[in-house]
């Protein structure tokens, strides 16, 4: 068996085109374009790259994009004041504060300060809680993007045994909730899990998000399983690889996401979708 490659670049572009068409229709109907505020504190190079891709995506679909590049010396109080201003701004539907924040800032406090109806990253406890109670509003971008990929490839996950490797607040935990909502029997593995191999070998669907290159040997993958690799790891050679041993895993899986070009593009596509959703459902008067 050779796995079908799940093309995240293609699906993300489709999603962005759909959002762009809906924005165009809004403007033609005399409504305002959705607005996204992107806040970057400091000079972290990776964060600058991520923020740049988000701003470009905004422009591509016709959003109003407001950028706030703050110096590393910005205080927590100053950042909270900016968020207060953006919470009250009627032209802004989504507020994104790029993580990680500089040392000394309480990221939980900052994220909880964002209006839950403008929390387009889906990190606010209110939005995570809504998802856990099966009544989601704004959903965490990477897990939402993964569900979109599975849907667009008509992969029926209901009834599958899904194993999520990694329990972060950004991917692992909300991914577990998304898969429960989709009807999976879900196991979440983490650093205290005993016999990880046993769990992987039982899985019909594996989602790996640990940030360690080739962490999951391909031979562990069950024949015909669906493999979603969230990891993005840069080797000394400059090559990007995932958390799963791709070349071996693709000979056993039925579907697999590549790195790069799999899950990554879907995170930004989900952010764009969330911003339009927030505009249409919460802020259109």
Swiss-Prot record:
PROSITE patterns: THF_DHG_CYH_1 (PS00766), THF_DHG_CYH_2 (PS00767). GO terms for cellular component: cytosol. GO terms for biological process: L-histidine biosynthetic process; methionine biosynthetic process; purine nucleotide biosynthetic process; tetrahydrofolate interconversion. Coiled coil: none annotated. It comes from Aliivibrio salmonicida (strain LFI1238). The keyword Cell membrane does not apply. Catalyzes the oxidation of 5,10-methylenetetrahydrofolate to 5,10-methenyltetrahydrofolate and then the hydrolysis of 5,10-methenyltetrahydrofolate to 10-formyltetrahydrofolate. Its EC number is 1.5.1.5, 3.5.4.9. PANTHER family: C-1-TETRAHYDROFOLATE SYNTHASE, CYTOPLASMIC, C-1-TETRAHYDROFOLATE SYNTHASE, CYTOPLASMIC-RELATED. CDD domains: NAD_bind_m-THF_DH_Cyclohyd. The gene is folD. This is Bifunctional protein FolD. Keywords: Amino-acid biosynthesis, Histidine biosynthesis, Hydrolase, Methionine biosynthesis, Multifunctional enzyme, NADP, One-carbon metabolism, Oxidoreductase, Purine biosynthesis. Belongs to the tetrahydrofolate dehydrogenase/cyclohydrolase family. Homodimer.
């Amino acid at each position: 068996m050779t796995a079908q490659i799940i093309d995240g670049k293609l699906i993300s572009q489709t999603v962005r085109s759909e959002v762009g068409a809906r924005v165009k229709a809004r403007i033609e109907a005399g409504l305002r374009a959705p607005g996204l505020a992107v806040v970057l504190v400091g000079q972290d190079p990776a964060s600058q790259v991520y923020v740049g891709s988000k701003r470009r995506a905004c422009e591509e679909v016709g959003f109003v994009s407001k950028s706030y590049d703050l110096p590393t010396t910005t205080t927590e109080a100053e950042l909270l004041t900016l968020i207060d201003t953006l919470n009250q701004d009627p032209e802004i539907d989504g507020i994104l504060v790029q993580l990680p924040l500089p040392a000394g800032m309480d990221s939980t406090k900052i994220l909880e300060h964002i209006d839950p109806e403008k929390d387009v990253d889906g990190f606010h406890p209110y939005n995570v809680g809504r998802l856990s109670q099966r009544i989601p509003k704004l959903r965490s971008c990477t897990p939402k993007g993964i569900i979109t990929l599975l849907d667009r490839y008509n992969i029926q996950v209901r009834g599958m045994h899904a194993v999520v490797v990694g329990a972060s607040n950004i991917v692992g935990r909300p991914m577990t909730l998304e898969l429960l909502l989709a009807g999976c029997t879900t196991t979440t593995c983490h650093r205290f899990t005993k016999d990880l191999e046993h769990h992987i070998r039982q899985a019909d669907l594996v989602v790996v998000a640990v940030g360690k290159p080739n962490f999951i040997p391909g031979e562990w993958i069950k024949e015909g399983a669906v493999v979603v690799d969230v990891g993005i790891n840069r080797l000394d050679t400059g090559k990007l690889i995932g958390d799963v041993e791709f070349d071996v895993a693709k000979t056993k899986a039925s579907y697999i996401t590549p790195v790069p070009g799999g899950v990554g593009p879907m995170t930004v596509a989900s952010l764009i979708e969330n911003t339009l959703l927030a505009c249409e459902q919460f802020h259109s008067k």
